[in-house]
């Protein structure tokens, strides 16, 4: 055990090192933004999933997991229409619980916590970068995002 990290009270012990305080920096902002856009967490299984076909995004998420010694695996599925779906899964009950409580899970239940409104600019830049990389569209005349969560869209617009 290492000071400054959170460990599960029960269950398998792993090498994962989840910090007891989330530093509001660019790296964590990007991860949280990607999670808000493309992620989901399941507490019982301890899975934290981010679905995206962009290899650069998958590498960013894999690096974030690896830095914290979170076991992870990438899954690629092709359907009958030859559409590819890529998901990276990290395995940490502690992280799944944290994300569920801090920013929500499933598209319709996500939100921006009040702590983000006073966050450092680097974190907010990372958050927007991650979020727009997942759910955003930038065209010649507009910048758009979409979400099933009214609270998330409202929170993003207030940042």
Regions found by a protein language model. Give the residues of each.
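Intein-associated homing endonuclease modules of the LAGLIDADG/DOD-type, together
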Residues: 1-159
